[in-house]
Amino acid sequence: NPQQDFMRF
């Protein structure tokens, strides 16, 4: 999910 990947840190 690229839209949620920004929160995968």
Curated annotation (Swiss-Prot):
It is found in: Secreted. The keyword Secreted applies. The keyword Oxidoreductase does not apply. GO terms for biological process: neuropeptide signaling pathway. Detected in the thoracic perisympathetic organs in larvae, and the dorsal ganglionic sheath in adults (at protein level). The modification Phenylalanine amide is found at residue 9. This is FMRFamide-15. It comes from Lucilia cuprina (Green bottle fly). The lineage of its organism: Eukaryota, Metazoa, Ecdysozoa, Arthropoda, Hexapoda.
